[in-house]
Amino acid sequence: MDCENKNVVLGNGLCMQKDPLNWGMAAEALTGSHLDEVKRMVAEFRKPMVQLGGETLTVSQVAAIAAGSVKVELAESARAGVKASSDWVMESMNKGTDSYGVTTGFGATSHRRTKQGGALQKELIRFLNAGIFGSGNDSSNILPHSATRAAMLVRINTLLQGYSGIRFEILEAITKFLNQNITPCLPLRGTITASGDLVPLSYIAGLLTGRPNSKAVGPTGENLTAAEAFKLAGVDGGFFELQPKEGLALVNGTAVGSGMASMVLFETNILAVLAEVMSAIFAEVMQGKPEFTDHLTHKLKHHPGQIEAAAIMEHILDGSSYVKAAEKQHEMDPLQKPKQDRYALRTSPQWLGPQIEVIRSSTKMIEREINSVNDNPLIDVSRNKAIHGGNFQGTPIGVSMDNTRLAIAAIGKLMFAQFSELVNDFYNNGLPSNLSGGRNPSLDYGFKGAEIAMASYCSELQFLGNPVTNHVQSAEQHNQDVNSLGLISSRKTAEAVEILKLMSTTFLVGLCQAVDLRHLEENLKSTVKNTVSQVAKKVLTMGVNGELHPSRFCELDLLRVVDREYIFAYIDDPCSATYPLMQKLRQVLVEHALKNGETEKNLSTSIFQKIAAFEDELKALLPKEVESARAVVESGNPAIPNRIKECRSYPLYKFIREELGTVYLTGEKVTSPGEEFDKVFTAMSKGEIIDPLLACLESWNGAPLPIA
């Protein structure tokens, strides 16, 4: 026999759906690159309108509504289905059918019965208004208004599917509140997200029904009564008198937890891409070896998150001016640094990849949740029955948020390890300790305070990585004996996102400081080389009588010393006898003198006799030349341009330095690190970092470089 549409024929002749368990749908949702998905999310976030139909809502659309600048439109095609379920409830009530939450009590007391359906809904809202707000201007116990907007949107989307027994007019009223930026005040705490987010959602119902304790906030932050909110939103006809089942329809859902989870995941996905790009910039400024991104390594590991993370880093590093310079340095002196970079650099794709897979999977889980019907009972008009189940159990939220938070903690841990290497002159391949940018390291401690702050952020973030969902308490007379704690987990993940933004901000400013230090290093090294060469030619080439002197052969080895020595190890006092430059330049001259043989005994051909003159001339000239080179770099007209301009990571650097106006930090300036961090953190929180971040990857074709 043949099967129609999406069915398949089994061996026994029966027909079944191709994907009856939705595993195929879940797998298909993860096709394509994570970066492409982030780009899609950003594009959706920026659209001016969200049309709700019940089944196509996305995380980015929820985040956009939460941000407050987007309008909502209800699909007119949903009206008939919503009305049908509402009518069914009323007809069922009139026939005397016994239905949970319509004629019965609630939860563990559902053995009670009543025929006063409207009064029952009113009592439901009253007893669920159990939240605590505090008094005065204290907002610490109020759910953020952005999260409330997200919850309102998700709840409308669920109710639009026509299984909930609620009037379309109520959904239109909530939509008007959203579009006029009028937000009910919901308590921050008090829900276990099973049976849904009962307590917070009851305050949306309280506003709709005009409860005297209901409060709202207007477009400019003004406090509104229910009557003022209705008038300002243009909701006509007065407060709603809830019909049977309508109160339950409003409160019996997971919208608060999944709404906040959507907001969290929108930011988390972007921060994950930022972590990939910053890891590549870290490799650039640390003079890392790019082979850690080689596709064969990651192909043999098979994990898609790792393969993509490596490919993104490979793209940033491919053709990087820093990588080219580092390769020359490694060839010149292969023993100057370890054969392999440390784990925070070399294994960053292996570390970030699984976190990205978790974040992506969680995003899809939440997208399924915000398009789910979470009521109990469900009204199945087609079969003329109410189905009692447990879709209000928000386990997908609790689990996905716990997993996401652990992934965020892992990203933060990597960031801290990378930052710790960056500021430590034992590990950072020639950058100054603390990334100090001034002339006198004894009066410039650079990012030392920032490193302490990063340790604090990382510790708190690791604590937040602990799960919420293993702290379930049996509730409501042991009826709700297992519950998801979805909103609690979402809230903790929102905290984790804020901390990761603090860490990302600090690290990003540190990377820009390192870029500028590499630029200064290159200019100063060129100046030192030119000066040493100039002095060598002047002092070492000729003897006292104008004859060629044996010391003329020392110049090449002297310049090799300059090439090999880390500039910031001596540049604050370049001619100090206790610093490595003068010591090693003298060592070169001594070694040449020892090889000079018998001619060394002759004062006119002695290289030893030239050492004092060479050092005196260098001391007279080098400090002035170094200061002049610094001044030229600071004036913005350096002899050697900043390599970052030749790199794919430049858009991010340009944004931080030019558009946000952050400065190169030194102890010579009044500006503190925290002032610059604030500029970046504010921009990051506004989403302004997205475009320069994506610009770094604009030319990536979505695949690793071919294995040559």
Swiss-Prot record:
Biological process per Gene Ontology, one example term: L-phenylalanine catabolic process
Which top EC class is given? lyase
Modified how:
Contains an active site 4-methylidene-imidazol-5-one (MIO), which is formed autocatalytically by cyclization and dehydration of residues Ala-Ser-Gly.
Query: What is the residue range of the signal peptide feature?
Result: none
Q: What is the catalytic activity of this protein?
A: L-phenylalanine = (E)-cinnamate + NH4(+)
Recorded superkingdom:
Eukaryota
Keyword annotations of the record: Cytoplasm, Lyase, Phenylalanine catabolism, Phenylpropanoid metabolism
Q: Can you tell me which residues bind (E)-cinnamate? A: 252, 340, 346, 376, 448, 476, 479
Cross-link 5-imidazolinone (Ala-Gly): residue positions: 194-196
Q: Where in the cell is it found?
A: Cytoplasm
Task: Output the PROSITE patterns linked to this UniProt entry.
Answer: PAL_HISTIDASE
Locate the 2,3-didehydroalanine (Ser) modifications and list their residues: 195
Active site per UniProt: 100
* Pathway assigned to this chain's UniProt record: Phenylpropanoid metabolism; trans-cinnamate biosynthesis; trans-cinnamate from L-phenylalanine: step 1/1
* Membrane listed as a keyword: no
An example GO CC term for this entry is: cytoplasm
- NCBIfam families, A to Z: phe_am_lyase
What is the role of the protein in this entry? This is a key enzyme of plant metabolism catalyzing the first reaction in the biosynthesis from L-phenylalanine of a wide variety of natural products based on the phenylpropane skeleton.
How this chain assembles, per its entry, is: Homotetramer.
Q: Which family does it belong to?
A: Belongs to the PAL/histidase family.
Identification of the protein by name: Phenylalanine ammonia-lyase 1
Task: Tell me what organism the protein belongs to.
Answer: Daucus carota
